[in-house]
């Protein structure tokens, strides 16, 4: 599971302290002007891990997490912030991460959206978030009505899931699963990056399996 060295943990602790201190100043400025401050946890999250002991001290109003998989949904929902938002794939770009067409000739973004949603949905049934969204260039969707229809269906399912959670907590088997590794709480529900970036490591497969199972995970 890519265990850290002592030197790396010391460096990360130093960076987390530095980033939290500087970020708090910026968040205070935002709040001073009556606005809310959200953090986008993905492209560059050095020092900003949501399960880190300093994350709450920054005072963010929400966390936005780009998701491919169920464990990423649980990571977002697990963070101690008022609002949790998932940023769905595919992104509204002409090509995907692997260079294949998405919102361009030959692309089938509606199939991509449904495939990712299946992984996300099973996790959301266990633990909810407040909001969902997309990122990229909105005008690219104009020539892909099947994608727009798919997103409308996904949004309806998401609203249903939110309502189910409001009606009551999901059933949980009398089973507690503990995940223990050298990262400790810092890497709760994650390892390093997305599933396709770390799929050679057993921990990410364990996290993804647990993300949608009706068990108590610690």
Indicate where each model-derived feature is located.
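Glycan-processing catalytic domains of CAZymes
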Residues: 1-218
């Amino acid at each position: 599971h890519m265990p850290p060295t002592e030197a790396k943990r010391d460096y990360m602790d130093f960076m987390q302290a530095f980033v939290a201190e500087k970020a708090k100043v910026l968040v205070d400025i935002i709040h001073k002007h009556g606005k809310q401050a959200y953090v986008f946890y993905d492209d560059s999250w050095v020092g900003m891990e949501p399960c880190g002991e300093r994350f709450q001290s920054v005072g963010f109003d929400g966390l936005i997490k780009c998701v491919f998989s169920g464990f990423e949904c649980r990571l977002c929902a697990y963070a101690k912030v008022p609002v949790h938002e998932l940023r769905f794939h595919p992104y509204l770009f002409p090509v995907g991460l692997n260079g294949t067409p998405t919102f361009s000739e030959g692309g089938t973004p509606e199939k991509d959206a449904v495939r990712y949603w299946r992984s996300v949905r099973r996790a959301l049934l266990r633990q909810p978030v407040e909001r969902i969204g997309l990122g990229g260039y909105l005008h690219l969707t104009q020539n892909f009505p099947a994608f727009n229809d798919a997103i409308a269906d996904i949004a309806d399912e998401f609203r249903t899931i939110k309502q189910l959670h409001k009606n009551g907590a999901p059933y949980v088997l009398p089973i507690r699963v503990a995940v223990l590794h050298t990262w400790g709480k810092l890497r709760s529900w994650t390892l390093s990056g997305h599933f396709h970036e770390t799929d050679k490591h057993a921990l990410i497969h364990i996290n993804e399996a647990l993300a949608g199972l009706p068990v108590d995970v610690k």
